Amino acid sequence: MTTASQTRTPRGRRSARPSGDDREAAILATAQRLLETKKFAEISVDDLAKGAGISRPTFYFYFPSKEAVLLSLIDPLIKRADSGFDNAVESMPADPQRAIRRGIEIFFNSFGSHPATARAGTEALKSSPEFKEFWSGLMQKWIAATAALITAERERGAAPDTIPALDLATSLNLMNERTMMAALADEQPGVAPEKVVATLTHIWLNSIYGTLPVGTA
């Protein structure tokens, strides 16, 4: 004898609801897509929530602000650039010229892999105290590491003792920031993207070590 439970037609499974990770990823993907065509200031929390298929209150469960979304997008770029800088510093004694070029190259390529995100970061520096404080901390770290590098090269007799190492390090890092972002934003005047690494490397090497033969960089 067949029971009712055996003859009952199985109910279809309910479609799985998006997980928290899925919703967060959707917000980030929406931000990346919008940044390709809009300035950061033109994008609202409502835009991000709508694009991710969630409500505005739900958005705030995952991010406290649109600036926090941008920080999440930029974080992997910064980690890649930071790692490249640290590796360059470690290899300085063996081949300082190649190490400096490689550090600049990794830094530029990291942000160049997502130029729209990098441009949004530059824009946020002018409008978001939260983002400005975050970026300032990174710049201070890179400047301090560069100053230590210059000092070490001077102490081992590889570089001349000229202007204060911290002043030189500050100027070089600020130059990198402005030159790279201008290239990524296709600003004029600006250095062409394919020439940025060679140009900055030339300036760094000549500033730290003095005049170098043409083609050394």
Curated annotation (Swiss-Prot):
Gene3D superfamilies named in the record: Homeodomain-like (1.10.10.60), Tetracycline Repressor, domain 2 (1.10.357.10)
Site (Inhibitor-binding): residue numbering on this chain: N173, N176
InterPro entries associated with the record: EthR_C, Homeodomain-like_sf, HTH-type_TetR-like_transc_reg, HTH_TetR, Tet_transcr_reg_TetR-rel_C_sf
Keywords: DNA-binding, Repressor, Transcription, Transcription regulation
Recorded GO MF terms: DNA-binding transcription factor activity; transcription cis-regulatory region binding
Task of the protein: Involved in the repression of teh monooxygenase EthA which is responsible of the formation of the active metabolite of ethionamide (ETH).
Protein name: HTH-type transcriptional regulator EthR
The gene coding this protein: ethR
